[in-house]
Design a protein with these regions (language model features):
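Polybasic/polar functional segments that serve as interface/processing modules
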Residues: 1-33, 43-79, 84, 91-95, ...
Length: 113
């Protein structure tokens, strides 16, 4: 799957379970870690877990499994699909860590151009 196909499938799956504030961050010019981050919120720990599970199910059907999964019971689940990384967070964690502002304020890396 291409990055854009993964991105579309991940955001669609998150939206199906009513994830809130789904944001896509294009980090290609800022990091070699991934091309995109998808950040979304769940209303409870169970909602966060359900969103992450739905994404994993949809991606598995397409033969794409995460390289790594972190925080399955912590209110912040991270699924690393290589070029696309999903962050599903409770609002409290999202406000505290503010990944969107962190990555948007970061300057492009000239070595990645």
């Amino acid at each position: 799957m291409t990055s854009n196909e993964k991105l579309a499938l991940i955001t669609e799956a998150a939206d199906e379970l009513k994830a809130e504030r789904i944001e896509t961050l294009d980090i290609r010019a800022k990091s070699s870690v991934a091309d995109y981050f998808v950040v979304c919120s769940g209303t409870s720990d169970r909602h966060v877990q359900s969103i992450a599970e739905r994404v994993a199910e949809k991606m598995t059907v397409q033969k794409s499994r995460p390289f790594r999964v972190e925080g399955e019971r912590s209110g912040w689940v991270l699924q690393d699909y290589g070029d696309v990384v999903l962050h599903v967070m409770r609002d409290e964690q999202r406000e505290f860590y503010d990944l969107e502002a962190l990555w948007e304020s970061m300057q492009p890396d000239p070595n990645l151009a």
